[in-house]
Swiss-Prot record:
GO terms for molecular function: actin filament binding; ATP binding; ATP hydrolysis activity; calmodulin binding; cytoskeletal motor activity; phosphatidylinositol binding. It is found in: Cytoplasm; Cell junction; Cytoplasmic vesicle; Cytoplasmic vesicle, Clathrin-coated vesicle. This is Unconventional myosin-Ie. Residues 730-922 form the TH1 domain. Belongs to the TRAFAC class myosin-kinesin ATPase superfamily. Myosin family. GO terms for biological process: endocytosis; glomerular basement membrane development; glomerular filtration; hemopoiesis; in utero embryonic development; kidney development; platelet-derived growth factor receptor signaling pathway; podocyte development. It comes from Mus musculus. Residues 1050-1107 form the SH3 domain. The keyword Nucleotide-binding applies.
Length: 1107
């Protein structure tokens, strides 16, 4: 019985199940219902990301998803959007690359309601940018601060609400600053409207800020003793809402993360202790209660004064005095006098709460300031901004804080509308682009209702006016505000009032605000008495948190909380408008916070108010990309010689020349007055792909030239270092002691089937096909790869079942981390056999390039372990076998390899039971060293004398390897030994093991540079239009006359390539199977001179046949 779920594929594999559409621009029907249905399909299949053009839609999965690891970072780094499934890494990579290439600041605006996943999205962006950007220790320090700022600010600024277990109760705009090279070398955080009232009051079922619970759960016994920490229900402020624990939050572990974050950011341990003292002091402050004595407030139990006074470094009596009374200044007849006013119980509670809120807010500002100082740089160059701000929220009772939060979200929605709907359509008109307008709701009318100054004044202006005229009056101010609102804006279509407050018709729906406390919270005044109290602290750190000049601050009207948030919101909008914006629209699928729970009506509501339908319609009817002519030319100039390095003519004509050079259909773009507009993303991807290929081609040329320069410069040094490993310990081969080191003997660049086993960015130091001997001493071929981290042995096996049954595929046989190698054993003779010793079992290998391999392995081993690689030389070697649980050779065991003096330069292997007998003739003395006279000079000639042939054998064609010994098909004739050069060549042919040629080839690097190979990069959906363009743009050949007869066979001798060959040096030819090569000169060494595609060079004659 077959199982439906038997085959489980990775979400990004080519055979992955498709779920809905990746980009909702491709939806066949554009309705809210079809959008919701597509999102639901993808969400249920764990696809949380979907595109609308370049806008990313993210649905909160309420669980950890598996696709945020190193594999995905490598997959999305440098990739075009269409290459991989939708992902937040694709957006982050686009921001990073555009910043570097276009030299423009970028920002991402993450919006959505509370609990939709905005904070997590921001973390993923910051984490991705940190992982893909380079840099040294200083840059790494900045990266650490960027990443560690998250847990620190979350501890002091996030809390559990009824809608979100980790809700941001503040907004932040995080600018990551970069050097011109793309390394993060600085940063800056701007924070907005911390909801400090949460310290003293909150809705039932919610918590205060995480740090209070972290301290109680995670403090050490000594800290608990010194800070007076006990159970959570002991503290009045925490017991208000009756919620202490959260299912998916570990307060004890998070406390350690918070302390670690403070260490990374550079907050001294003394300051950390004082920060925790203040946190504990706030909790103890809340336990001070008041009773009424003769209409005035008195502290109910004075013993509760002692601990907060001690923790805050203030006098206990002074604390009592400032909580129950206040100094008021009054002016009468030009004279000023202070009046001592005793407070009632309600006023005393308000004063206590005001001090607690102020302490938490000042500590939070200190932490933000500490982070900014740790990342500060002298001057700004480029930056990526990440906006993570509290989401739109509606509670049972919505007060002043919700009013401000929803106002900021209203402003963010206005930015989105301005830049994606309104501005885009207006731009088409300004640029003279053919366009059909699309209707949409512009929420500017709601923003004006809240923030307008005049005609009519907005809610915030009326609120400030009431606070100014009734600044000395506490009672009745809120009702006066409601009356003024009803009188001045009561007829506004987006405003309604009720007996205890008012309603605003926000873009996300109607919200009812309770007027209670509106004016008091808007005033946000910290009484001078409390500032004086904290300035009297014996602790300099606490004093520094209250730097006010009391005499100067008495003059002028204090700034209200509403005007502050309005200014901050408008400053934020100005900052965002200066950047190239990117958007993430977060959707909350349910209120249960459980995975796979889908509330259709809730999601549909969000889809409607986020304007996704209109966004799809504008994107579908409009142009995916627009750019100023000059910027477009600057980015794509490299595509043609006429535009590179600079276009001399009219910019518009230059843009047209570039688009025509890539054969882009005229209906895929329009040229406006100052910008180019490209319709389909595929057309843009075509340009990007060709640009990347151009840069890649030039980079390869530079890289190749540089590598050759470095290789030649270090050639002698490398050979001598390698030779030192074997000096006085092992005989050397005559024909390999002076040879060049190439490293890659199997052409890894053209071997994706081997590259799959190695990390994408892992450098391959050495690659060769070696012989590996098993427990019966039977030799099999293995590809040996060495990287800075690991050693790989790769074999081949036939697939035994499935659709690929019978196909031979590469299989990873062994992977050994470099530091796990115990030692390497070799004989003292000139053979090529060595044993890799590892804890589990050993590997017996044979490679003609053993000296080069061992020298590279020794370097990597020393880098990893700071020790020398143990090399053992003996003519009797022990081999530990792998344990197996079947067959006659089970239970592991060991084998022995014995070496004897024989004849000739080829090793003769004779297995006998558990011993392998190896005999070989004498080689060069053990004290032999490389000589400089045979080294390759800068022109590639031995000893400075011109020689047109490589210093190695012509490679053997496929199928010429038998039992680990190479049998060359080419045998030089006897007269070839007559001159020294040919004699030397023949010795190499009989001795050295060349690279293993491939049966099939994807083509050499040369072919990728020819114009023909660019045909496949055309826009995929051109179809008939492409054919029409080709037929209309050029006349029929020779006016339609019949082709002439082909030319007679040339007199120059030619040969046909039997196999593909990749050049190993600059004077060699690369060719593919079936290429026709002109033969210029034949040589008995096996290396002929020929000409192919205008290039003359050497090639191995056993790879071709004459025609």
């Amino acid at each position: 019985m077959g199982s439906k779920g038997a085959y489980r594929y990775h979400w990004q594999s080519h055979n992955v199940k498709h779920s809905g559409v990746d980009d909702m621009v491709l939806l066949s029907k554009i309705t809210e219902s079809s959008i919701v249905e597509n999102l639901k399909k993808r969400y249920m299949d764990d696809y949380i990301f979907t595109y609308i053009g370049s806008v990313l839609i993210s649905v909160n999965p309420f669980k950890q998803m598996p696709y945020f690891g190193e594999k995905e970072v490598e997959m999305y780094q440098g990739a075009a959007q269409y290459e991989n499934p939708p992902h937040i890494y694709a957006l982050a990579d686009s921001m990073y690359r555009n910043m570097i290439i276009d030299r423009e600041n970028q920002c991402v605006i993450i919006s959505g309601e509370s609990g939709a996943g905005k904070t997590v999205a921001a973390k993923y962006i910051m984490s991705y940018v940190s992982r893909v950007s380079g840099g040294g220790p200083k840059v790494q320090h900045v990266k650490d601060i960027i990443l560690q700022s998250n847990p620190l600010l979350e501890a002091f600024g996030n809390a559990k609400t009824v809608r979100n277990n980790n809700s941001s109760r503040f907004g932040k705009y995080f600018e990551i600053q970069f050097s011109p090279g793309g390394e993060p070398d600085g940063g800056k955080i701007s924070n907005f409207l911390l909801e400090k009232s949460r310290v003293v009051m909150r809705n039932p079922g919610e918590r205060s800020f995480h740090i209070f619970y972290q301290l109680i759960e995670g403090a050490s016994p000594e800290q608990k003793q010194s800070l007076g920490i006990t159970s959570m229900d002991y503290y009045y402020y925490l017991s208000l809402s009756g919620s202490y624990k959260v299912d998916d939050i570990d307060d004890k572990r998070d406390f350690q993360e918070t302390l670690h974050a403070m260490n990374v950011i550079g907050i001294f341990s003394e300051e950390q202790t004082l920060v925790l003292q203040i946190v504990a002091g706030i909790l103890h402050l809340g336990n001070i209660s008041f009773k009424e004595v003769g209409n005035y407030a008195a502290v109910e139990s004075e013993e509760f004064l002692a601990f907060p006074a001690y923790l805050l470094g203030i006098n206990q009596d002074r604390l009592k005095e400032k909580l129950t009374s206040r100094q008021m200044d009054s002016k009468w007849g030009g004279k000023s006098e202070s009046i001592h006013v005793t407070l009632n119980v309600e006023q005393a509670c308000y004063t206590r709460d005001a001090l607690a809120k102020a302490l938490h807010a000042r500590v939070f500002d200190f932490l933000v300031d500490s982070i900014n100082k740790a990342m500060e740089k002298d001057h700004e160059e480029y930056n990526i901004g990440v906006l993570d701000i509290y989401g739109f929220e509606i509670f049972q009772k919505n007060g002043f804080e919700q009013f401000c939060i929803n106002f900021v979200n209203e402003k963010l929605q206005q930015i989105f509308i301005e830049l994606t709907l309104k501005a885009e359509q207006e731009e088409y008109v300004q640029e003279g682009i053919r366009w059909t307008p699309i209707e949409y709701f512009n929420n500017k009318i709601v923003c004006d209702l809240i923030e307008s100054k005049v005609n009519p004044p907005g809610i915030m202006s009326i609120l400030d006016d009431v606070c100014a005229t009734m600044h000395a009056v506490g009672e009745g101010a809120d009702q006066t505000l409601l009356q003024k609102l009803q009188m001045q804006i009561g007829s506004h279509e987006h405003f309604n009032s009720w007996n205890q407050g008012f309603i605003i018709h926000h873009y996300a729906g109607k919200v009812s605000y309770d007027m209670d406390g509106f004016c008091e919270r808007n005033r946000d005044v910290l009484f001078m008495d409390l500032i004086e109290l904290m300035q009297s602290s014996e602790l300099p750190f606490i004093k520094s948190l209250f730097p006010e000049n009391l005499q100067a601050d008495k003059k002028g009207r204090p700034t209200t909380a509403g005007s502050k948030i309005k200014k901050q919101a408008n400053d934020l909008v100005s900052t965002l408008m200066k950047c190239t914006p990117h958007y993430i629209r977060c959707i909350k699928p349910n209120e249960t916070k459980k995975p796979k729970d889908w509330e259709e009506s809730r999601v549909k509501h969000q889809v409607e108010y986020l304007g996704l339908k209109e966004n799809i319609r504008v994107r579908r009817a409009g142009y995916a990309y627009r750019r100023v002519f000059q910027k477009f030319l600057q980015r794509y100039a490299i595509l043609t010689k006429a535009t590179w390095p600079v276009w001399r003519g009219d910019e518009k004509q230059g843009v047209l020349h570039l688009l025509q050079s890539v054969n882009m259909d005229s209906d895929q773009f329009q040229l406006g007055r100052s910008k180019v507009f490209i319709k389909a993303p595929e057309s843009l991807f075509l340009l990007e792909e060709m640009r990347e290929r151009k840069y890649d081609g030039y980079a390869r040329v530079i890289q190749k030239t540089w590598r050759k320069f470095v290789a030649r410069k270090k050639y002698v040094q490398m050979r001598e270092e390698a030779s030192d490993l074997l000096l006085n310990k092992k005989e050397r081969r005559r024909n390999s002691i002076n040879r060049n080191f190439i490293g890659d003997y199997i052409g890894m660049e053209e071997r994706p089937e081997l590259q799959q086993f190695v990390g994408k960015r892992e450098k391959i130091d050495f690659a060769d096909t070696v012989t590996k001997y098993d427990r019966r001493f039977k030799g099999v071929k293995r590809d040996l790869l060495l990287t800075p981290k690991c050693l790989y042995l790769i074999g081949r096996e036939k697939v035994k079942q499935g659709p690929d049954k019978g196909v031979v595929k590469e299989v990873l046989k062994r992977r050994i981390e470099v530091e796990r190698i115990l030692s390497v054993s070799l004989s003292t003779m000139q053979d090529d056999i060595f044993i890799l010793h590892e804890q589990e079992y050993d590997s017996l290998l044979e490679s003609v390039f053993k000296t080069e391999f061992l020298s590279l392995l020794a370097k990597r081993y020393e880098e990893k372990t700071q020790k020398q690689l143990p090399l053992k030389f003996s003519n009797t070697l022990e081999l530990k076998l792998k344990k197996e649980n079947w067959g006659p050779w089970s239970a592991g065991g060991s084998r022995q390899v014995q070496f004897h003096q024989g004849f000739g330069d080829l090793a003769i292997l004779k297995p006998s039971n558990k011993v392998l007998q190896v005999s070989i003739g004498p080689g060069l003395p053990k004290n032999s060293r490389p000589t400089r006279r045979n080294t390759v000079t800068s022109r590639g000639y031995p000893g400075g004398t011109k020689n047109n042939y490589p210093m190695r054998a012509a490679p053997a064609p496929p199928g010429c390897h038998q039992n680990g010994v190479i049998r060359n098909q080419f045998v030089p004739p006897p007269h070839a030994f007559g001159n020294q050069r040919s004699n030397q060549k023949s010795l190499y042919t009989s001795m050295a093991r060349p690279p293993l040629p491939r049966q099939q080839s994807t083509g050499s690097d040369r072919l990728s540079q020819t114009p023909e190979s660019l045909d496949f990069l055309k826009v995929p959906d051109q179809g008939v239009a492409g054919v029409r363009r080709q037929t209309s743009s050029r006349p029929p050949p020779a006016g339609g006359r019949p082709k002439p007869q082909p030319k007679p066979k040339p007199q120059v001798p030619q040969c046909k390539a039997l196999y593909a060959y990749d050049a190993q040096d600059t004077d060699e030819l690369s060719f593919n199977a079936n290429d026709i090569i002109d033969i210029i000169k034949e040589d008995p060494s096996g290396w002929w001179t020929g000409r192919l595609r205008g290039k003359q060079g050497l090639f191995p004659n056993n790879y071709v046949t004459k025609i």
